[in-house]
Regions:
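A short, structured loop/turn motif at beta-sheet edges
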Residues: 13, 45, 70-75, 94-104
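Hydrophobic ligand-binding cavity/cleft-lining segments
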Residues: 1-47, 161
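Beta-strand elements of well-folded, non-transmembrane domains
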Residues: 9-11, 58-60, 111-115
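Glycine-rich portal/gate segments that line the openings of hydrophobic small-molecule binding cavities
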Residues: 28, 38-85, 138-156
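Short, surface-exposed coil-to-beta transition loops
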Residues: 2-4, 62-66, 87-92
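Beta-strand/loop substructures that line and gate deep hydrophobic ligand-binding cavities in soluble
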Residues: 81-134
Length: 161
């Protein structure tokens, strides 16, 4: 199953990229949402190959996932690999500078089933793809707004024009 979303952010691509690779902030966000995060000892802390083991409560069960950074292109692209017992996939975040102070963030998410149960679940999601797509777009817009707020605060403004 493939999903995409995009949003425009009033911040330079370098600032958006720095926000997206802030591992500590992402770990706090995931923990706030109820997941457990573990940094595997056999993976680097930053850069390509860095990863996290997640235990995520989903539909009444705890799902275990391994998320790793597969590729980084500074100020342009991040690629994450996702592996679980039932699914695998990838997430690609691309940054397109629109102007020196504006960046378009594009997210492409692909999830592939590894088991029959996962295939049935993804087929069910395909039936509700409109809702799933809308939720993803909303999350990406919220991420963009959060990065804009961080940028405004870093420049000493309150975000009001």
């Amino acid at each position: 199953m493939k999903l995409t979303a995009k949003t425009d952010i009033e911040a330079p691509a370098s600032f958006v990229y720095a926000s997206l690779i802030d591992h500590a902030a992402w770990e706090r966000e995931v923990i706030r949402r109820g997941a457990e995060v573990e940094r595997p000892a056999d993976m680097p802390l930053t850069g390509v190959g860095a990863g996290w083991r997640l235990k995520v409560p989903f539909r009444g069960k705890v799902r275990k996932l391994l998320v790793r950074i597969d590729a980084l292109t500074p100020d342009a692209r991040l690629v994450f690999g996702i592996e679980g017992q039932a699914v695998e996939g990838s997430s690609v975040l691309e940054l397109l500078p629109m102007s020196p102070r504006s960046t378009r963030l594009r997210l492409a998410l692909e999830v592939r089933p590894k088991t029959l149960a996962a295939r049935l679940f993804l087929n069910t999601l395909r039936l509700a793809k409109g809702k799933v797509q809308a939720r993803l777009e909303k999350r990406v817009e919220q991420l963009g707004a959060r990065i804009e707020d961080q940028h405004d605060r870093s420049r000493g403004r309150d975000g009001k024009v």
